[in-house]
From Swiss-Prot:
This is Acylphosphatase. Keywords: Hydrolase. It is an enzyme of class 3 (hydrolase). The active site is at R20, N38. InterPro entries: Acylphosphatase, Acylphosphatase-like_dom, Acylphosphatase-like_dom_sf, Acylphosphatase_CS. Its EC number is 3.6.1.7. The gene is acyP. Residues 5-93 form the Acylphosphatase-like domain. It comes from the Bacteria. GO terms for molecular function: acylphosphatase activity. Coiled coil: none annotated. NCBIfam families: PRK14443.1. It catalyses: an acyl phosphate + H2O = a carboxylate + phosphate + H(+).
Length: 93
């Protein structure tokens, strides 16, 4: 099956609340490979690769806020964006 890609930019109260750590666990649940990293503007960027159904479930979970301490304002989604192929999902520092 073909794997789809997406870049997500998540804004709100998403840094310093375990957002990247819990995003990594959600990624494992849905067999997502890619990365998650904090950006200097206070947002978080996620690069994700997975089969379409799993990618959509992952995006829905991110929209709900994977971390209990986070507050999502908006999730910008760029489906089909070029993403580096990876075998794992990693937190980038």
């Amino acid at each position: 099956m073909a794997r789809d890609t997406a870049i997500l930019r998540v804004t709100g109260f998403v840094q310093g609340v375990g957002f990247r750590y819990t995003t990594k666990h959600v990624a494992y649940k849905y067999d997502i490979s890619g990365t998650v990293k904090n950006l200097d503007d206070g947002s978080v960027e996620i690069h994700a690769i997975a089969e379409e159904e799993n990618l959509n479930k992952f995006i829905d979970a991110i929209k709900k806020g994977p971390s209990p301490g986070c507050r999502i304002e908006h999730v910008y989604i760029y489906k089909g964006a070029p993403v580096e192929e990876r075998k794992t999902f990693d937190i980038v520092y």
